[in-house]
Amino acid sequence: MFIDKGASPLPIREAKMQKTAYYENSGLFGGYTYAKPESYSYGPSQQQYPQSSLDNDYPSTACSVQPAAIRAPNHKTNDISNSCMRTTSSQNSNQTPSISNQQHQAPSLPPSSPSHSNTSAQKKSKSSNSSGSSQSTMNKQIFPWMKESRQNSKQKNSSSTPPAGENCEEKSPTGPSSKRVRTAYTSAQLVELEKEFHFNRYLCRPRRVEMANLLNLTERQIKIWFQNRRMKYKKDQKAKGIMHSPTGQSPDRSPPLSGPNLVGYSSQLPTVNSLSYDAPSPTSFAKSQQNMYGLAAYTAPLSSCLPQQKRYPGAEYEHHTMQGNSGFANPNLQGSPVYVGGNFVDSMPASGPMFNVGHLSHPSSASVDYSCAAQIPGNHHHGPCDPHPTYTDLSSHHTTQGRMQEAPKLTHL
């Protein structure tokens, strides 16, 4: 009982102290709020409440909220310094929706709103500055070196630009992997180069320098063009030679010669007694026989014993009598024709005399038929492996009495 009696006056005193504190501070809030309305702008929708209605209608709520309202400015200034104004203002507005709470928050919001706007502006400016700085750093990291490389390439191209009228592009300096751009020549330059190539396939350096100055080209470009043009000329010549050759071979190739059957081609001379070109023969060839042959005669390897030879002057032909194992005719191939004295004759049997040209022994014969189409047997074939080379591509030639026809011209020599 004593505890109850002693404890009863304490809440009354606390209530009186809170009321007096409220009425003492109400003037402060009233002057802070209503006496100086021009110091803080609230907008056109700001409502002012009379003090009497607050005192009569909401005494207890105002007393209960008063200490928090008194502490609010200091607390919120600390929050402003810590950049936490937005969260505290939103919490206070959500937790105390009453009119008195709005009134007590009114003096606290005015200093906070400009500071909050300032902080938001500062945050925006900082974010914009940070974004601008990040963009600038990104620009510095990516774009400037590319722009510098382009400027450098432009400067290099401008410094290395050739004179007017030249359509050649220099080597691009963008990277080591870039290839040299193909040089484009104008029609006038090509005409001059082709004209010069027609007269001189190889240019000396003074002429090359002169043409470089004349055509606005470099000396190196002219040199490379002439190298390429010479290679093209060689290819064209080879293609023409293959097309014009009858056998499809290149003209610089001659029929193959093998073994002891080496053929001596006679030179195309008008006289009969002139010396003919004899191919190198084996060691068994007799030296005394070299000058005994007329025009277009084949030299044949002989054996150790030489038969007697009969030499005819002028347009007459000599008769050869040889043994069966020496000569072009092989006993196994008796049907192969042999070219002797400008004519094709069929080989005789191995036991009898060979190369006996019967229809040429008389000078009074009207004409001699050189055509070989009727004298070639069916079993004869041409090829590089044929040990008895014969020539069937000769056209028909005719000779009269006392005059000898020249040997057929060989175009591939």
From Swiss-Prot:
Major localization listed first in the record, in broad terms? nucleus
Q: Looking at the UniProt feature table, which residue ranges are given for the DNA-binding region?
A: 178-237
InterPro entries under this entry?
DUF4074, HD, HD_metazoa, Homeobox_Antennapedia_CS, Homeobox_CS, Homeodomain-like_sf
Give its localization: Nucleus
| Region of interest (Disordered), residue spans | 36-181, 236-265, 381-413
What does the UniProt keyword field contain?
A: Developmental protein, DNA-binding, Homeobox, Nucleus, Transcription, Transcription regulation
Q: Name one GO molecular function term.
A: DNA-binding transcription factor activity, RNA polymerase II-specific
Offer one Pfam family short name for this entry.
Answer: Homeodomain
Question: A Gene Ontology CC term for this entry?
Answer: nucleus
The GO annotation for biological process reads: anterior/posterior pattern specification; embryonic skeletal system morphogenesis; regulation of transcription by RNA polymerase II
Q: Where is the composition biased (Polar residues)?
A: 54-64, 392-403
Instruction: Output compositional bias ranges, type Low complexity.
Output: 37-53, 87-107, 114-141
Question: Motif (Antp-type hexapeptide) spans which residues?
Answer: 142-147
* Function description: Sequence-specific transcription factor which is part of a developmental regulatory system that provides cells with specific positional identities on the anterior-posterior axis.
Q: Which family does it belong to?
A: Belongs to the Antp homeobox family.
This chain belongs to which protein, by name? Homeobox protein Hox-D3
Q: What is the lineage of its organism?
A: Eukaryota, Metazoa, Chordata, Craniata, Vertebrata
